[in-house]
């Protein structure tokens, strides 16, 4: 493969990666913990919303640390799902190169 062709392919891959990044900004995932807490994040893992069911406040009324743990679990779940979504979208668009790029974002 000559240098010009390689450069063109790299530019196409870069453009596709940028398009995926824009899509991920609009895509959302939801992480949860015991059905009491939900965390919504975009495809980059940025937290967009946090929802507590009233039962969560009642169940952890005397255990604020337990509620904090539940929140962390839901946040981590949302971020894990966002990371998996990012890898999947990059791989779908760019194949093996996409998987490498997905790990970077």
From Swiss-Prot:
One of its GO terms (cellular component) is cytosol. GO terms for molecular function: DNA binding. Its main location: cytoplasm. Pfam families: YbaB_DNA_bd. Keywords: Cytoplasm, DNA-binding. InterPro entries: YbaB-like_sf, YbaB/EbfC. It is found in: Cytoplasm, Nucleoid. Binds to DNA and alters its conformation. May be involved in regulation of gene expression, nucleoid organization and DNA protection. Belongs to the YbaB/EbfC family. Homodimer. This is Nucleoid-associated protein TTHA1599. It comes from Thermus thermophilus (strain ATCC 27634 / DSM 579 / HB8).
């Amino acid at each position: 493969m000559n240098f010009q062709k390689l450069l063109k392919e790299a530019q196409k891959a870069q453009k596709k990666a940028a398009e995926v990044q824009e899509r991920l900004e609009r895509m959302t995932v939801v992480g949860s913990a015991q059905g009491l807490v939900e965390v919504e994040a975009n495809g980059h893992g940025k937290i967009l919303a946090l929802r507590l069911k009233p039962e969560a406040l009642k169940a952890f009324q005397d255990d604020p640390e337990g509620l904090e743990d539940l929140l962390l679990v839901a946040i981590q779940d949302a971020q894990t799902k966002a990371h998996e979504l990012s890898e999947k979208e990059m791989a779908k668009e760019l194949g093996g190169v996409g998987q490498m790029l997905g790990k970077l974002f």
